[in-house]
Each structure stands twice: as C-alpha cells, then as structure tokens.
Design a protein with these regions (language model features):
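Bacterial N-terminal signal peptides
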Residues: 19-34
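Hinge/capping helix and adjacent helix->loop/strand transition within the periplasmic-binding protein
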Residues: 97-104, 110, 118-205, 254, ...
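An extracytoplasmic/periplasmic, membrane-proximal ligand-sensing/linker region
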Residues: 43-45, 230, 278-340
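N-terminal secretory signal peptides that target proteins for export/translocation
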Residues: 1-17
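Short hydrophobic alpha-helices and adjacent helix-cap/hinge residues
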Residues: 9, 37-40, 68-72, 121, ...
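Short beta-strand->loop
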Residues: 126-136, 172, 194-198, 216-217, ...
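N-terminal (or domain-start) structured segment
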Residues: 37-129, 168, 176, 192-221, ...
Length: 340
C-alpha cells in the first residue's frame, strides 16, 4: 500500500520538481554537515600568531579580531602570540610550518605576506603556497607627515622644497624593507624627489626623531601620528590611498595632489596554514566574514584610524594577495631594492 502511494506521488511530480526536491534535500544535508563541523571546531586553544611586537597596528587588529572570533565561537579561546623578528618573517614562518589543524593561525600584513618575498633572501616560507588566505581584516592608510616647522603646507610644497634641496631632506621608517619604508620610497620615486632614508627599529623611535626635528618626514599610520598632529607638532600633507579617509576627510590624496591613480597602502589579513582541512577553512572563512562585516568590528577599525573592509571572503582575499605579491615585486625592482 505504502509503495503504491509513493509511486503515485513520484509520478505526479514533474522532473523539474523532483530535481528541486532532491536539491533541497542535499542542501539541508550540507547545512547539517557544516553545522556539525562548526560545533566540533575548535578542539583546543586557537593561537593567532603575529610577527610584530605588542602595540603594532597588526597586533592591535589581531587582538580585536581574536576577541570577536572567540565570542563568535561561544567563548572558545583565541589567543594572540607575538613572535617578533626578521620583519615579521619569524612568526609567519612558524605558522607556515605549524600542524594544519586550525589551531595555529596567522594575522599578517602587507609586509609579511607581499613584500618580504622580494626583500629577504631564503625567506623560510612562500606566501603564495604555504597559506590559505581567509579574510582581509583592514586596510591601513599611510599619511605623508612632516615636522610642523618644515616650511610646507601641501604635498606640492614638499616636492618643490625637495627639488630645491636634493638629498637634504630625509625620511624615517620602522626599518629597512618595512611597509612605511617601501611606501615612502614609492612616493619619492613617483614624485621624482631625492630624499634620504633613515631606518629605525620600529616606528616609535622614528616618530620621536620626527617630533625633535631630526627627520623631515615619515609616511606613517594615523594612530602613530594623529595625537601629535592634534597637538600641532606634526602636519599631514597627503594620504597614499586612492580615496580620502573617514578619519581625516580633509586630507588630500596623492591622486588629488598631482599623481593620478596613486595607490600604495598597507593592509592586514587573516590566513591558515596550507593543508588545513576544508571543513575547518570553511568555518573559519565564514565566521571571519561575519566578524569583519559586523558594525562592531568596523567601528573599532575606524576608532583605530584604520579602514574597515565592506565585505571579505577567502576568494576575494586570495585574489587580492596574489595581485599584491606581483605588484610589490614590480615596485621593489623599479626602485632598486634587492634581497638581503
């Protein structure tokens, strides 16, 4: 009797309707499978490795992100660990070599994931092969900043002064090959000015010397310089991203300052070691997208002087990262930087 009823029902269904029913069934099973995996993950403490010291922009973003990921996983522990050294490559390499079980993850930067391959000989990891990009967390606008006594009030003024005194002006950075070194070098190359690079061990001592007048300028993040701009000790002349920023909407872009299309900014991203099981990657990618897309995370990024991402996905970040690796290879070749 039951079999006859089933046959009648099936015969009454059109082929397309049957396909829709079966598709819905498989979709439901897929959701149940994903839900099961999300319940199982994480199986222990999740370590998020940062290759920079506490207080660095990458570290600060990692801590905000880790806290919100922990909340998204019902209080599961997401702990930030700083493994400092070699322009962030020590910590990054540690993640590349870690067991790919989703318990050791990376919050890296444009420096560690896109610039270091062109700066460091025998780099102990390949960012294009050793990681699975999961989410871009924030972009980090960089600002051309000068000491307040320097007689310039715009980027155009700065270029004119530098051309009047070739080699006399100098700029500081947080170290050879750092993001603010390379971006400043691109600024100088694009505007055809001759300024001398002075590397420091971190941004803090460089900003100290900028305040003291021992440096002419820096290309730095808002968190590092904005307090001193507000106090009148520093001046911001331009931002290196293609659009103005929410935190400093009156600051001109370099595109608006005579260099159309100029775009050289830092960013921070989230990745897992290659070989991590697909179901874990899916859970991490989906949850990271929810965190990064939340109003809470976006508000915190703006508060820090960073630019939140409107949307992000593993595929988007992977495509962006591959483009950035190629772009910075071209840039380092153009400005004459060789691997050391």
């Amino acid at each position: 009797m039951t079999n006859r009823i089933i046959k009648k029902v099936l015969s009454a269904l059109s082929h397309q309707a049957l396909v829709r029913v079966m598709s819905a069934l498989f979709f439901s099973l897929a959701l149940m499978t994903n839900f099961a995996h999300s319940v199982e993950y994480p199986s222990g403490v999740v370590r998020i490795i940062v290759g920079f010291p506490p207080g660095n922009a990458t570290d600060i973003v990692a801590r905000v992100f880790a806290k919100q990921m922990s909340e998204a996983f019902n209080g599961a522990p997401f702990v930030v660990e700083n493994m400092v050294g070699a322009a962030g490559s020590i910590g990054t390499a540690a993640v590349a070599k870690a067991t790919p079980n989703g318990l050791t993850l990376l919050v890296g930067s444009v420096g560690t994931l896109a610039m270091n391959p062109w700066l460091i000989k025998n780099l102990p990891y390949d960012p294009a092969k050793d990681f699975v990009p999961l989410a871009q967390l924030a972009s980090v606008p960089m600002y051309v900043t000068v000491q307040s006594t320097l007689p310039v009030n715009s980027f155009t003024d700065l270029v004119a002064l530098a051309k009047q005194k070739p080699g006399v002006l100098n700029f500081g950075s947080s170290g050879n090959g750092s993001a603010n070194h390379l971006i400043a070098a691109v600024v100088a190359s694009t505007s055809s000015i001759d300024i001398t690079h002075i590397p420091y061990k971190g941004s803090a001592p460089a900003v100290t010397d900028l305040l003291a007048g021992r440096l002419s300028l820096m290309v730095e993040t808002a968190p590092a310089v904005l307090p001193h701009v507000k106090s009148g000790k520093l001046k911001i002349l331009a931002v290196t991203k293609p659009t103005r920023t929410a935190i400093l909407p009156d600051v001109l872009t370099l595109s608006e300052s005579g260099y159309p299309g100029f775009d050289a900014q830092a960013w921070i991203g989230f990745a897992a070691p290659a070989g991590t099981p697909r179901e874990i990657l899916d859970v991490l990618g989906r949850t990271a997208a929810q965190v990064v897309g939340s109003k809470l995370f976006a508000a915190k990024m703006v508060e820090l002087g960073l630019e939140p991402m409107a949307s992000t996905s593993p595929a988007q970040f992977s495509s962006y990262l591959n483009g950035e690796i190629k772009r910075w290879g071209t840039v380092t070749e153009r400005i004459g930087i060789v691997r050391e």
